[in-house]
A protein has these predicted regions:
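Structural signature of nuclease core domains in nucleic-acid processing machines
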Residues: 16-20, 36-358, 365
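C-terminal accessory regions
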Residues: 3, 7-36
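Short, small-residue-biased leader/transition segments that mark boundaries at the very start
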Residues: 2-6, 359-363
Length: 366
């Protein structure tokens, strides 16, 4: 006769989801109840650890491990990270989000095994590369986003994406019909993005000054002669000027949905736009030393090719598309600066600003 090695077996399930709304248990729970009708079911009482998790600093570690880990010894930390630390904005956000995840990724160097496939991250990487390539081409040839014809823009996008796809991952993008479809989809996204950039710039007087502007800045000196650097790339810096001031707008391209969140910024979870603005202002001050450098906007452009429903004409379709492509983020509350970014009236289709009947801007401001 077989004997069980454990006295009791427990199966648990959540009563509430992440949004604290009630959720139904898995169908497996119902099956077990039918198979074992004598199984007892009860709600676990709140434990001290649950209260401690909410009320006591670092209690989450106590709850999950039962002990507080010691800080790495100096020698081990130096062996892992070295005396010169270089981190991206993403790595800073990772540390603020989960220090253990940061340790695994940047200390131990752990990562998922690479597979021969075209992943979601690759889609965004190629789109960024195409937008950068075409944007620099426009600037180097003294062309204008605003005046670029649809045919010329589409041709530049096709040439750029074909060249990048040919050299990407040993032609991984050419090995299936699905990936060929993705190439066409990326062309549509890139073309729509560059079209939107032209429309948005046409409504104001800001003009692109730099694309994919890299930076490497020493943050501070740490104990034991450790140096700390932050690196990154700013997707786009737009500027405009008057007699005394230079106004700076930072735009970051995202393939997902992103918006400025003050609470996450405060806790270090989303510091990208603020960091980019700081570096952009330093960069522009070196070029325009005699002017005051004024931040105008921190904006995300979410890359997409929206489909809209319209019953009237092409103008209505364009207006709806531009509304879907409106940038998100925060802008300077100065009305004159806002009009430099968008001189149109009413609710802007370019930036997160709308005007009331008293002609006062309703905005997200910095």
């Amino acid at each position: 006769q077989r004997q069980m090695c454990i006295r009791d077996s427990y199966i648990t399930y959540a009563r509430n989801g992440m949004d604290m709304k009630a959720v139904l248990p898995s169908y497996i729970i119902r099956m077990i109840k039918k198979m074992f009708p004598l199984v007892k079911e009860y709600a676990r009482e709140d434990t001290f650890a649950e209260h401690a998790y909410i009320r006591i600093p670092k209690a989450d570690i106590v709850w999950s491990e039962g002990n507080l880990n010691k800080v790495l010894a100096e020698g081990i930390a130096l062996e892992l990270y070295g005396r010169e630390l270089t981190g991206s904005v993403t790595s800073f956000e990772q540390f603020a989000s989960c220090q253990f995840a940061y340790f695994c990724q940047y200390g131990l160097g752990l990562k998922e095994r690479e597979e021969y496939q075209f992943a979601v991250n690759d889609f965004g990487t190629i789109l960024h590369a195409v937008i950068e390539d075409v944007s620099k081409n426009i600037k180097q040839n003294n062309k204008s986003f605003v005046l670029l014809s649809d045919e010329e823009r589409s041709q530049m996008v096709s040439e750029s994406i074909n060249a990048i796809a040919e050299n990407y991952g040993n032609t991984i993008l050419k090995d299936s019909s699905r990936n060929e479809y993705l190439i066409q989809r990326m062309k549509n996204y890139a073309d729509r993005t560059l079209w939107a950039i032209g429309k948005q710039l046409a409504d104001g007087i800001f003009r692109p000054d730099a694309f994919e502007k890299g930076f490497l800045t020493q943050i501070e000196e740490l104990p034991h002669d450790v140096l700390f650097y932050m690196k990154g790339k700013i997707d786009r810096i737009d500027v405009c000027e008057d007699d005394e001031n230079l106004y700076v707008k930072v735009v970051d391209y995202k393939t997902g949905q992103s918006d400025f969140n003050l609470l996450k910024t405060y806790y270090g979870l989303k510091i990208q736009l603020l960091t980019y603005m700081r570096e952009a202002m330093i960069y522009e001050k070196k070029k325009y030393g005699d002017k005051n450098i004024i931040p105008a906007g921190l904006l995300y452009y979410n890359i997409q090719d929206p489909i809209v429903e319209a019953k009237k004409d092409d103008d209505e379709v364009e207006a709806l598309i531009r509304k879907e492509l409106r940038m998100k983020g925060v802008v300077n509350s100065n009305k004159n600066i806002i009009s430099m970014m968008d001189s149109t009236e009413g609710s802007s289709v370019n930036i997160p600003v709308s005007y009331t009947h008293l002609t006062l801007p309703t905005i997200c401001s910095v």
